Amino acid sequence: MSDNNKKLIIFDVDGVIFKSQFLLCLSRNSGILSYIRAWYLCFLFSINYLSMRILLEKVFIRVKGLKEEDLWQLYCKTKMVANAEKTIQEINNSGHYVALISSGVPDILMKDLAEKLDAGCGYGIDVKIDSGFCTGEIGGLLSYSDGKLQVVEILL
C-alpha cells in the first residue's frame, strides 16, 4: 500500500479501548463519595452544563496526593474491550497509522497504552506529578473542550 493510501485511524480510549471511563475508575478508587461526585459531574458535562476543563479540574483535585504508583496500578487494572490489541494490529498490518486519544486518561498512561497496543502514538491530559504524588493540577490541549480537534489537526 502506498503512502497516498495510508490512513490515520483515531480511537478515543474511554468506552472504546477501555470498557469504562477512566475518570470514574479513578474516582471510585478515592472512595464512594468521590465516585458519586464524579458521576454527577460527568452527567453535568454530558448535558453541556460543565466544560471539559472544569470537569477535569474538579475530578483531579479530589485525587490530589494520590501516589503515582497507585495511578499506574489503577491503569493496569482497567479492563480493555475484547480484541482491542488484535484490531489495532490488523489496522497496522493494513498499512495505516493508529492514534489513541483521551481527555480523561493521563498522558503518561496513554503513551504506555499506545506502546502496549502497538499504536503509533497516544495522547492524554497532562497530570502534574511532583515527588511521586499527583498535585491535582492538569494541563495540555486535551484538558480543553476543543483539545481533541487540535490534536487531530497536529496529527494531520
Predicted regions and their residues:
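Active-site neighborhood of HAD-like aspartate-dependent phosphohydrolases
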Residues: 1-53, 57
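Long, low-complexity, intrinsically disordered polar/charged segments
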Residues: 4-9, 60-62, 69-71, 92
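Broad structural signal for hydrophobic residues in well-ordered alpha-helices, predominantly aliphatic
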Residues: 26, 59-60, 113, 155
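Short coil/turn linker and secondary-structure boundary residues
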Residues: 47-50, 66, 143-147
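Metal-dependent phosphoesterase signature
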Residues: 53-86
